[in-house]
Every structure is written in C-alpha cells, then in structure tokens.
Amino acid sequence: MPGMQYLKKLLIAITVAAAACQAFAAAPKQPKSGVVNDDATVSLAVYAPKAASVTVGGDLAPTKMTRGADGIWRGRTRALRPDYYTYFFNIDDVRTIDPANAFTERNEMYLSNYVVTDPELRSQDVPHGTVAKVWGPDGRRMTVYTPAGFDARSDRRYPVLYLLHGLGGDENAWPELGRAPYILDNMIAAGKVEPMIVVMPNGNIAHKAAPGDNPGAPAQPVSRPPRTMNGEFEASFPAIVEWVDSHYPTRTDRASRALAGLSMGGFHTIHIARANPAMFGYIGSFSSFLHPRKYSDSKSYDNPGPALRALADAKPLLLWVGIGKTDFLARENKEMLAEFDKAGLNYEYHSSEGGHTWKNWRDYLRLFLPKLFK
C-alpha cells in the first residue's frame, strides 16, 4: 500500500538521521591550536587518542605535548620574541600539519603551519601595495610588488629591487616565507623605506614557475632542481631587467637599481653583479658564497677575480653582506669576503646570531631596505 511504503521510507530517514546525530555527538570537538596568548606563548593541541607520542617540530620545538583523558594532546611554548614561527607535529614519528591551524606554508617540499607574533610581518592598517604574478621573458614567472599608490599611467617612476630566492625556492619564497610584501607595506608606511618596485623571479632554469604553476605536467617540489648553478640564470638576467623596464615605470639609472638574494640567490647576485658591473648600484648578499664547489661543476664560475675587480672599479653604492654565526656556509662566506678584499671591493658586513634560516633573511631584508635609493 502507498501509505505503508511512505511510512517505511520515513522510518528509514529518521533512523539515518539519528545515527548521523549520534556520530556527530561522538565526534571529538576540534581543539583550538596555534593560538598566540597574551604572555607571548603559543598554545598547541591535536586530537590523537591512539598515539603513543606527539612531538613538535620546526621553530616551536621543543614544546612538550601531554595527552589528556579526552584524547587531545596539549602543549604551550616558551614565551616567544616577536617573529614568524613555523611548526608541525610528529604523531608517532609521522610528520603532519596541525589540522586546527589553517595557516600553512610550503618550504621546498615540506608543509608547515605558522604563527606570526611580529606586527611588522603581518598585515596592518596601512596603505597596501599590490602583489602580482606575471610571466616575464622566456616564460619565466615572477612575483612583482608595486607600492601603495602605484599608477602605471602616471609620470612617476620608481626604483627597483630584484630579490632572489635560495636553492629549492621559487617566485613564491620571498612573498610567503620572507613576508616581503608585509615588510614593504609596513616599512614604507612608517617612512623607513623608499617606495619601490620589487621583482622576485623564479631562479630555476629547469622550472620556470612554482610547482603547480609550471607549464606542462604538474611537478612535485624538489630541494635541488637541475641547472640552478651552471651560469644560465645569471646570463639570462639582463633580459629580466630589460623586460621589467619595458613593462613598468622604472628609473633605469644604476643608482635606482638594487639586487639581493639569499643563499643560492646571494650566489646568483654576486655573479650577476660582477658580470654587469654598471647595472646595479646596491647589492645584497644574504648567507651566500662565491664558489659553488659541490653544488656545481660549471666552469662559468672559475677565476672570478678579474670580474670582481671590474665591479670594484665601478664602485657600487653599497655591497651589503650578512650571515649567521652558526650558518653552515660560514666558511664559504669568509672565503668570499677574502676574494672581495683581494679585488679591492668594499662591503658592509653584518654578523648575526643563528644559522641558515628565514628568520635571519627576513631580518637582513629589513636591515637592507632602508639603505636603498637614498
């Protein structure tokens, strides 16, 4: 009978709904995690009732995690100085991100969560610049920052900083891990930095864009893409400068151009600058080196002395070198400085605590920017 069929369907629907409600009620409440507290500590939590151990990796290690009767592991960090901190969980030795913290980053092939405790490294109520992803010469992708108030149709022309990433990075490294747009917005608004265009190109010859955006089949990120230190990127760099000058209202004199990079990007910076001594007035080398050794067997980096002397003769307005005291490239960096001394190349040297880290590179950028285009 139609009435009986309707009743059966209704009973089935009620049963399914009741089961769903029971399952929802039994599901654990998602704990709050990645919470910055008033005392500058960060609260972490993850639901893992069957785990034998939960530890914290990254910048927030070591933070002791303790399991509660509700199956939630909780921990609280030490009081943190203002900065940008990354972390992840190891649940029974399996690395995983924090499911309760939506803020994630990719560094090379690794995903982590992050918390920001430094106001200068996050968005503030100030005029904001624009961040664009553009395809430059030879199909190379670049991130371009233009400052607040930028209007390509106006008569105003801007100085340009070219900012290069390290090994395993791409055009997203400085904007995301380096927090460059936030730093620029806040420092420009504070009157500490001259409004400028900042060009952050992909420096991987074999991969012209970040993973997922590279033309062709999607490729997973790798820590050392091929052909990154064989001279090709350095040789192609004048074409990037020419492209930027033809697409943006730039000032094209040497005193209005700066070039800086971290690690491999600092290595690229020095070799680009020595090959083009009249192109850049300001040069920044962050945790970098001159001789690739185990990283490359290319002959293009042999005998840099004559080109360094030509760079010295061109008298850069600033050559700024920064490195951490425990950086694994400290010895190579000292060898680079010895080559500079031998060539008569003047530089400003900054030694900091810490090693080969984004914390240092963000700090170096903040030290370098106010020195530009004065």
Predicted regions and their residues:
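Hydrophobic alpha-helical membrane-insertion segments, chiefly the h-region
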Residues: 22-24, 167
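Bacterial N-terminal signal peptides
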Residues: 11-22
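Non-catalytic cap/lid and distal C-terminal segments of serine-dependent acyl enzymes
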Residues: 30, 36-63, 67-374
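N-terminal secretory signal peptides that target proteins for export/translocation
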Residues: 1-7
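Cleaved targeting-peptide boundary
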Residues: 24-32
